[in-house]
């Protein structure tokens, strides 16, 4: 998967189209990413009491994962781009590059 944790992405389809956010978590086995402030859902949690007597629960708003095909990585220029790879000559490792301008990400 070409999108990693910490990347800034732009949502290109769905109800949050046009929103930018940071990837909080990536799920490569499911091809999904958790983006900050995108795909917010309301989750109903059971009311529980802690040892100090505080009660928690009710309706909680949180982010839900979104499919990786619905986001594009934003490059250093602030524009969405596709991702490619090149092999670094010194280390021999793959480095992600922007297809739009050819710079490293």
Curated annotation (Swiss-Prot):
Q: Which GO terms describe its molecular function?
A: rRNA binding; structural constituent of ribosome
What GO cellular component entries does it have? ribonucleoprotein complex; ribosome
GO:BP terms for this protein? translation
Q: Which UniProt keywords apply?
A: Ribonucleoprotein, Ribosomal protein, RNA-binding, rRNA-binding
Q: Which Pfam families match?
A: KOW, ribosomal_L24
Q: Which domain of life is it from?
A: Bacteria
Asked whether the UniProt record includes Ribosomal protein among its keywords, one would answer: yes
Matching entries from PROSITE patterns are given as:
RIBOSOMAL_L24
NCBIfam families of this UniProt entry?
Answer: rplX_bact
Q: How does it assemble?
A: Part of the 50S ribosomal subunit.
What biological function has been recorded for the protein in this entry? One of two assembly initiator proteins, it binds directly to the 5'-end of the 23S rRNA, where it nucleates assembly of the 50S subunit.
Query: Into which family does the record put it?
Result: Belongs to the universal ribosomal protein uL24 family.
Q: What is the protein name given in its UniProt record?
A: Large ribosomal subunit protein uL24
Its source organism is: Mycobacterium tuberculosis (strain ATCC 25177 / H37Ra)
Species lineage, top-down?
Bacteria, Bacillati, Actinomycetota, Actinomycetes, Mycobacteriales
